[in-house]
Amino acid sequence: MDGVANLASQQAWRVARALSGRILAQSESGGNANSVWSPACVANLLAVAREGSAGATRWELDALLGDGDLLVEPDPFDVERKPAWGYDGYEASSATAAWLSKLATPSDAFLRKCDECGVHVSVDDLGDPRVSREVSAWISEKTRGLLSPAISLSSVALACLVSALYLKDAWADPFEEYLTNRALFHAEDGGVRVAFMHDERCCRVIDGDDCVAFGMPLSSDAEMLFTLPNSGGDHMGEALELFERLSCGEGERELVELGIPRFECETTIPDLGMQLEAAGVYSASAMNLVPMVGVEPTPTQVIHGAKLSIDEKGVEAGAYTIMIACAGCPPENPPEPRKITLNRPFYVAVVSRTGAPLFVGRVTLP
């Protein structure tokens, strides 16, 4: 990871800071032990939505995303495979597409922007179940089958904007499976024995006020980040601060004796609009999308789903974000290794080579 955050990374971090605490808290209040979401995927969709918005909606999205246009980069989060990368199994993609109703009247400027940025636009009868299946199949294809949500567009839908993100990468130095053993994880509701991966690594480490954070490099020079609080409670704000500092290249290199549990997180957020409204996009449930669909206000639903898993080999993660607009509706004489065992609830993030927050999550029960 080069430690230089490009514009897309900066905008994704703005979205991460605005929404992570609310999204993960809502997911956990819904009974999910582990939760994850993709700030980069959401930022990508909102950047396209901004181009199709006007009035108050445009101002609110400008305030959330900040200045600049992440859409000018063909690979804004720098995840597309490079020939020099050594892991043959590496796969990643970031894509956005739009389905517009035959009744929508998008502006030439919006269609031209989509064409310039590689956002494929289809015009169809969105009420036809075939289109819903097509959208679901597109998400499944872009996430390599990891996510296949059931989509149901109504006959009054004027637009369906979809963003997808996928990453499959190996650790730069994979864990040896024979070192994995079962040990106690101190969950909030009591201890449980889970599989821990073990090794000694030289990691970048930052000590926060009440947390310790470290990074684990991936084969592509992306990185998976971990933050382990020293006490219970909500530490999302400090975790994000430490993740962002690590993504910018901060941290002292230390020899660390690691203990990391294998885990999987999956989260579906059927109404991201509430979190967007709380973050200042007050029109999230009824956006002004005149440049996209030709009418306003437009009842709007935003849906987000994400999945993340790690094992001895590496990480696999995927996400999608859907916006439906309706008519009316990770020395020579070495010191003793520092020991970090993630044996209690902790935070995770995956950042791209440019430091963009691809995924952010919390693990309370591996």
Where are these regions (language model features)?
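Detector for small/aliphatic-rich hydrophobic stretches
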Residues: 1-126, 363
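Short amphipathic beta-strand starts and helix->beta connectors
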Residues: 25-33, 209-210, 239-245, 331-332
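Non-catalytic, conformational "gating/processing" segments within enzyme and secreted inhibitor domains
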Residues: 32, 76-231, 251-332
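Short loop/turn microsegments at loop-to-beta-strand junctions
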Residues: 35, 212, 344-346
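Extended intrinsically disordered, low-complexity coil regions enriched in Ser, Thr, Gly, Ala
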Residues: 55, 234-236
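Short Gly/aromatic-enriched secondary-structure transition segments
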Residues: 61-65, 175-184, 236-247
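C-terminal soluble interaction/assembly domains
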Residues: 306, 312-366
